[in-house]
């Protein structure tokens, strides 16, 4: 029952010095390293999340924004297919907007809801209506405590959890994300194009691969 990993991300403007795929590249590069140490299946990455145009408009900046309500049916169909294959240990990882992961942001919320809906539909199809109320499920809460809950078959996680974020300069295209890219994907960084015109990029000059390594570790 190897873990099946789905890298989730967006294409979003990250200043002039970082690749627009930064949020996704951070996830895929971390998973590349994890794959050397653990038995996992990595699915092709999904780049087209709900980036929004909060940072910058799309013209000349490369941001691609797919609304969450469009992501939901796609994600539900994808998860349904993975369940039909037989996977029961599916994990999505996302970096975009995860400083608000506990409350949720459009992309991760869409995939979380899709996971629940896909599991509900799968269980009802496989076990019939009333499956949870059946006498066979009398030990549901005991099994849930033992991590046998079917709603754990698909989970979505932040690349950096809350504890890691407290220890790392989490930001958008500043020291933190630029450092992550210097460590994980240096070809996606061009400090020769750096501009301090935007407030969110100004700390990028302080970035280093060593700081990025601390975030990855």
Predicted features and spans:
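Extended, histidine- and acidic-residue-enriched regions that form the cofactor-binding/catalytic faces
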Residues: 1-217
């Amino acid at each position: 029952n190897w873990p099946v990993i789905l890298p989730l991300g967006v294409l979003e403007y990250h200043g002039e010095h970082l690749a627009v795929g930064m949020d996704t590249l951070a996830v895929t590069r971390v998973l590349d390293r994890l794959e050397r140490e653990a038995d996992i299946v990595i699915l092709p990455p999904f780049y087209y999340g709900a980036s929004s145009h909060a940072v910058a408009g799309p013209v000349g900046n490369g941001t691609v924004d797919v609304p969450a309500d469009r992501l939901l049916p796609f994600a539900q169909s994808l998860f349904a297919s993975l369940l039909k294959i037989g996977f029961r240990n599916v994990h999505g990882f996302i970096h975009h907007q995860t400083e608000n992961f506990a409350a949720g942001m459009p992309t991760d919320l869409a995939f979380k809801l899709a996971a629940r809906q896909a599991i509900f539909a799968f269980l009802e199809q496989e076990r019939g209506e009333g499956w949870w109320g059946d006498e066979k499920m009398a030990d549901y809460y005991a099994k849930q405590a033992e991590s046998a809950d079917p709603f754990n078959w698909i989970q979505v996680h932040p690349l950096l959890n809350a504890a890691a974020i407290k220890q790392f300069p989490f930001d958008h295209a500043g020291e933190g994300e630029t450092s992550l890219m210097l460590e994980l994907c240096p070809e996606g960084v061009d400090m020769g194009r750096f501009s301090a015109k935007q407030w969110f990029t100004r700390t990028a000059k302080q970035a280093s691969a060593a700081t990025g390594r601390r975030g990855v570790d």
